[in-house]
């Protein structure tokens, strides 16, 4: 019995072999929009010679309010798009898609997947107040994977807050808007009153809010996101599979079904990237 493949009846193992025989094939990433570019940046900085293909499914953002079945369906569609572009590894640069769909993706495709999960572990281990906050989507906080992670750290009080509206504002290019500021204050102030000393960002869009978060939070509260950990894991998996591309200039292609200007603005025109519609 062979796993599902978008390439017809060929055995997936054959394609798996081809992916890792061609180290110059790209790293594929997908997210429900522009947020996963925070993960892409971390990967690009750690692995500057790697070609990348990033898929921003902004039309369907946010994933966090969708059902598990919808999230799995969209994640499979995104995966197959990246496989058609010969991705040698796929980074699910979306917390909601990771916590709801990565198990299904790994069961359905032989390409390696890297997921992004809220960094509860380092926050819980290092917290001095034994109280940490997590800001995430509804889809992440209600997922089985997230709740299993929370159960491990029962000695730590974890204050969960759904970031309603944050992804939508980021996707609309309203990072520094009064609406954003108002929402962040309403979400963070109760956590501060509860004496948290760590805030875990449980959505790949949220690192773009760090400048605002730092203005609102007392300086003793540390902010943790997962970008660097995901980049290191991508490096480790490629290294183990002898799949690293170690020289030359990288090509980076970003596909979006949303407003490419938001994508360009969030990358701050700092990177050499080609933008395409899909």
Report the location of each language-model feature:
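Non-catalytic structural scaffold of enzyme domains
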Residues: 14-15, 20-278
């Amino acid at each position: 019995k062979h796993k599902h493949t978008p390439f017809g009846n060929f055995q997936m193992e054959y394609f798996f072999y081809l992916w890792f025989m061609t180290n110059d094939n790209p790293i594929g990433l997908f997210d429900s929009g522009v947020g996963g570019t925070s993960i892409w940046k971390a990967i690009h900085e750690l692995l500057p010679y790697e070609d990348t293909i990033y898929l921003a499914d902004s039309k369907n953002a946010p994933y966090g309010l969708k059902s598990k079945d919808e999230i799995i369906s969209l994640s499979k569609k995104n995966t197959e798009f990246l496989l058609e572009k010969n991705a040698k590894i796929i980074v699910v640069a979306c917390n909601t898609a990771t916590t709801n769909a990565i198990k299904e993706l790994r069961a359905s495709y032989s390409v390696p997947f890297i997921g992004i999960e809220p960094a509860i572990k380092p926050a819980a281990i290092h917290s001095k107040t034994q109280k940490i906050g997590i800001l995430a989507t509804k889809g992440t906080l209600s997922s089985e994977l997230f709740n299993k992670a929370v159960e491990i750290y029962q000695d730590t009080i974890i204050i969960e807050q759904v970031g309603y509206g944050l992804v939508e504002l980021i996707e609309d290019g309203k990072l520094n808007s009064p609406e954003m500021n108002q929402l962040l204050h309403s979400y963070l102030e109760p956590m501060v009153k509860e004496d948290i000393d760590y805030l875990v960002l449980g959505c790949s869009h949220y690192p773009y809010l760090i400048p605002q978060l730092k203005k609102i939070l007392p300086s003793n509260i540390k902010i943790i996101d997962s970008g660097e950990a995901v980049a290191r894991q991508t490096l480790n998996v490629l290294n183990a599979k002898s799949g690293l591309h170690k020289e030359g200039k990288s090509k980076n292609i970003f596909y979006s079904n949303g407003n490419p200007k938001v994508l360009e603005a969030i990358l701050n025109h700092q990177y050499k990237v080609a933008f395409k519609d899909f």
